[in-house]
Swiss-Prot record:
It catalyses: dUTP + H2O = dUMP + diphosphate + H(+). It comes from the Bacteria. Its cofactor is Mg(2+). Keywords: Hydrolase, Magnesium, Metal-binding, Nucleotide metabolism. Gene3D superfamilies: 2.70.40.10. GO terms for biological process: dUMP biosynthetic process; dUTP catabolic process. The gene is dut. Its EC number is 3.6.1.23. Pfam families: dUTPase (PF00692). It comes from Nitrobacter hamburgensis (strain DSM 10229 / NCIMB 13809 / X14). Pathway: Pyrimidine metabolism; dUMP biosynthesis; dUMP from dCTP (dUTP route): step 2/2. InterPro entries: dUTPase, dUTPase-like, dUTPase-like_sf, dUTPase_trimeric. One of its GO terms (molecular function) is dUTP diphosphatase activity. Signal peptide: none annotated. This is Deoxyuridine 5'-triphosphate nucleotidohydrolase.
């Protein structure tokens, strides 16, 4: 992959035997994260339940980058399973395991098995800003119109 940045990754013992996250098409934006739950005890999410799902993955993002953990559209569309804190942010200085907070918004229990692709991780540059106090702000045609103010 030309222009790719290198990210060092480690797998914890409970992820042994699982492949590193990978892109599953040539134009995919996200690397698929897999569940590192025990083979013998899959995780069952009842309808309305949420759980932290381990991936067994630790990464060292370069300065100026972040990773976002986002839902997989197929899980959401077919089963109502999504990432509860979407997008979950992984900061460049974080060196702990990446876990995925999944919620089952569907009507039936959903079983998460070892190695199942449960979320996608997008790595992107971060723009840092410096906020400055201001007495007034420039006017816009939208003004303070918020949720739904621009129509359907």
């Amino acid at each position: 992959m030309s222009g790719a940045i290198r990210i060092d990754a480690q797998q914890l013992p409970h992820a042994e035997g699982l492949p590193l996250p990978a892109y599953h098409s040539s134009q995919a934006a996200g690397l698929d994260l897999m569940a590192a739950v025990p083979e013998q005890t899959p995780l069952v999410l009842a309808a309305g339940q949420y759980a932290m799902v381990p991936t067994g993955l630790i990464i060292a993002l370069p300065d100026g980058f972040e990773a976002q953990v986002r839902p997989r559209s197929g899980l959401a569309a077919k089963h109502g399973v999504t990432v509860l804190n979407s997008p979950g942010t992984v900061d460049a200085d974080y060196r702990g395991e990446i876990n995925v907070l999944l919620v089952n918004l569907g009507n039936a229990p959903f079983t998460i098995r070892r190695g199942e692709r449960i979320a996608q991780m997008i790595v992107a540059p971060v723009t840092r800003v410096e906020l400055a106090r201001a007495v007034s702000l420039s006017a816009t045609s939208r003004g303070s119109g918020g949720f739904g103010s621009t129509g359907r």
